[in-house]
Amino acid sequence: MNPLIEQVFYVYFFISLTILSIAVIASKNIIHSAFFLLIFLLHVAAIFLFLNAEFLMIIQIIVYVGGVLALFIFAIMIMNIKEEFRHKRFVKFSIAGLITGFLFLAGLYIFLGTVKSPENVLIKSDVNSLGKLLYSYYFLPFEILSLVLLIAMVGGIIIAKKTPFDREGK
Amino acid sequence: MIPLSWYLLLSATLFSIGLIGFVIRRDLIVMLMCLEIMFNAVNIAFASFSYYNSNLTGQIFVLFSIAVAACEAVIGLAIVLALVRNTGINHSDEIVNLRG
């Protein structure tokens, strides 16, 4: 691909990702920030496509956009939040948070200015070799991850279940 | 060809924006969304390291990170739902039960 076109697309994704993530934390209605987060996750999937990681793009779209965002939107609909208009949106010391974040960003920029990119890049990544690596060398973390997912599912059901308010020993 | 530092700058920018949002908002659900933004920034850094080192380990760590982020979203939303259902509180400044 022509490198100029590639860089133009990269700059577009940089600007749109920044604007979308600012819109997530600055929008007044909470369902609007959920939908801004949806477009943000789709742009991150496009960034994965830039990095020759097609499998990660599919996983990002299926898990995040199909699972986590649906969970967020269902939770917002269940809670029926109207208290946003009673309160102020930001905390009192939000200036301190902004200064902390900008100092962190400035430190990272100074640190990242000297990064050199190596020559040998990943030419193409097939799902076959990724699965072989996952099922041979990273097999134990994969199994532990399945247990973590199971425990999170059971714990989420138990925490969110509607419990009877007064029990018998009252 | 895009150099490596561009992707790292994108990751740093998104992580800082998520950090700022986590500090200055008081909605519990928006704080969880800012956690998702920070997870995605770190995933971009992992995938770019995987690309520029021609090594697939970074992509496997992105898989693990996505699964842990899904667990975190499930548990966090369940806790927020239990709080709203039992006390009617949605803001992090009003949770003062443990203050004594």
UniProtKB/Swiss-Prot annotation, chain B:
Gene3D superfamilies: 1.10.287.3510. It is an enzyme of class 7 (translocase). The keyword Translocase applies. GO terms for molecular function: NADH:ubiquinone reductase (non-electrogenic) activity; quinone binding. One of its GO terms (cellular component) is NADH dehydrogenase complex. The keyword Lyase does not apply. It comes from the Bacteria. It is a multi-pass membrane protein. Its EC number is 7.1.1.-. One of its GO terms (biological process) is ATP synthesis coupled electron transport. It is found in: Cell inner membrane. The chain crosses the membrane at residues 4-24, 29-49, 60-80. It holds the Pfam family Oxidored_q2. It catalyses: a quinone + NADH + 5 H(+)(in) = a quinol + NAD(+) + 4 H(+)(out). Keywords: Cell inner membrane, Cell membrane, Membrane, NAD, Quinone, Translocase, Transmembrane, Transmembrane helix, Transport, Ubiquinone. NDH-1 shuttles electrons from NADH, via FMN and iron-sulfur (Fe-S) centers, to quinones in the respiratory chain. The immediate electron acceptor for the enzyme in this species is believed to be ubiquinone. Couples the redox reaction to proton translocation (for every two electrons transferred, four hydrogen ions are translocated across the cytoplasmic membrane), and thus conserves the redox energy in a proton gradient. NDH-1 is composed of 14 different subunits. Subunits NuoA, H, J, K, L, M, N constitute the membrane sector of the complex. HAMAP family: NDH1_NuoK. Belongs to the complex I subunit 4L family. This is NADH-quinone oxidoreductase subunit K. The gene is nuoK.
